């Protein structure tokens, strides 16, 4: 810090035209990131005449390069062996630093101080982001659903940073904003677990999509679930009872058909037997009726009368 104060005291009125990004620099968690800072050097510029300091966020020590040498002894433990200049680029006016293995605690404002006969400073904002996992969706209840039932679709996603923006859409791509409950809890590493629940009245069939938006990384991950309510769906017990009753009814109909067939056969036999008896009786009566009459003479009749 004393070296930085000395650098500022030695500065002249005319400042170097330092250039840094206007927008925040985005660093991925556990990846390397470059914090840009550069100027256009004059002819004859050499790094031996250069002094560079980077003021690190929330740190008492700074990272510096003075008159051709790195200042490593005052480097913060948090940044030790993780931050460095591009020494081969210094002669081109490139004062950028490489920050390795970005951590969540690295987020903040970094200020670049440069002195070459005169001095200037510029600040760079670093934002850290970690992508969320692909969401998983769960349905409750998930069985024996029919239109009109109330169901809850729950979306889970993990290990993202910072907090996510959650959006629900139906199958037509329309945003759903009612009956939504969302919670975001950070773990011991500072990464967030997001749980969002959507309660809906089930229709015949619809698709629900959970979109997870990372505001720093500007990326979206999503998952969809199609839910169908069956009008004619039966519980397993009812289905088996229905099948059992159908089988019993079929057996009963078969038995009834056998009884009817037997009864019909017996009736036919009796009718045939009765018809045979009637025919026999008719034949007997006809035979008796057709017997010849005995013819007697007149004399025989007189003798018979005399005998009487």
Swiss-Prot record:
Task: Please give, as recorded in its UniProt entry, the membrane topology of this protein.
Answer: Single-pass type I membrane protein
* Gene Ontology BP annotations: regulation of cytokine production; T cell receptor signaling pathway
Q: Where is the signal peptide?
A: 1-15
A single Gene Ontology MF term assigned here is: signaling receptor binding
Q: What is its main location?
A: membrane
CDD domains in the cross-refs: IgV_B7-H3
Q: Which residues lie on this side of the membrane: Extracellular?
A: 16-236
Transmembrane domains' residue ranges: 237-257
Q: Which residues lie on this side of the membrane: Cytoplasmic?
A: 258-308
Q: Does the keyword NAD apply?
A: no
Q: What S-S linkages are listed for this chain?
A: 37-112, 155-210
Under the heading Pfam families, the entry gives: C2-set_3, V-set
Acidic residues composition bias: residue spans: 299-308
Domain Ig-like C2-type as annotated: residue spans: 135-228
Cellular compartment(s)? Membrane
Ig-like V-type domain: which residues? 21-125
**Which keywords does this Swiss-Prot/TrEMBL entry list?**
Disulfide bond, Immunoglobulin domain, Membrane, Repeat, Signal, Transmembrane, Transmembrane helix
- Which InterPro entries does this UniProt record tie to the protein? BTN3A2-like_Ig-C, CD276_IgV, Ig-like_dom, Ig-like_dom_sf, Ig-like_fold, Ig_C1-set, Ig_sub, Ig_sub2
Region Disordered: start-end pairs: 270-308
The family assignment reads: Belongs to the immunoglobulin superfamily. BTN/MOG family.
What protein name applies here?
CD276 antigen homolog
Q: What is the lineage of its organism?
A: Eukaryota, Metazoa, Chordata, Craniata, Vertebrata
């Amino acid at each position: 810090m004393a070296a930085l104060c000395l650098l500022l005291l030695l500065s002249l009125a005319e400042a170097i035209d330092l250039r840094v990004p206007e927008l925040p620099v985005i660093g991925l968690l556990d990846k390397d990131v470059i914090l840009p800072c550069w100027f256009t050097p004059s002819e004859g510029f050499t790094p031996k005449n250069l002094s560079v300091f980077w003021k690190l966020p929330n740190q008492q020590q700074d990272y510096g390069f003075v008159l051709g040498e790195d200042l490593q002894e005052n480097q913060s433990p948090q940044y030790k062996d993780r931050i460095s200049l591009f020494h081969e680029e210094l002669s081109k006016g490139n004062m950028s630093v490489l920050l390795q293995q970005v951590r969540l605690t690295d987020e903040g404002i970094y200020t670049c101080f440069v002195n070459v006969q005169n001095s200037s400073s510029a600040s760079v904002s670093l934002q850290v982001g970690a992508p969320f996992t692909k969401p998983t969706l769960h349905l409750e209840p998930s069985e024996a659903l029919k239109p009109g039932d109330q169901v809850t679709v729950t979306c889970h996603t993990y290990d993202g940073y910072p907090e996510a923006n959650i959006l629900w859409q139906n199958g037509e791509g329309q945003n759903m904003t009612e009956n939504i409950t969302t919670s975001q809890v950070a773990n011991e590493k500072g990464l967030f677990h997001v749980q969002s629940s959507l309660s809906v009245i089930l229709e015949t069939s619809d698709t629900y999509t959970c979109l997870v938006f990372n505001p720093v990384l500007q990326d979206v991950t999503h998952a969809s679930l199609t839910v169908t309510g069956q009008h004619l769906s039966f519980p397993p017990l009812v289905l088996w009872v229905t099948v059992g009753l159908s089988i019993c009814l079929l057996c009963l109909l078969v038995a009834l058909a056998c009884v009817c067939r037997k009864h019909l056969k017996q009736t036919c036999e009796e009718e045939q037997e009765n018809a045979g008896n009637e025919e026999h009786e008719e034949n007997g009566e006809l035979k008796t009726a057709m017997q010849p009459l005995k013819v007697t003479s007149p004399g025989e009749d007189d003798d018979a009368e005399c005998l009487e």
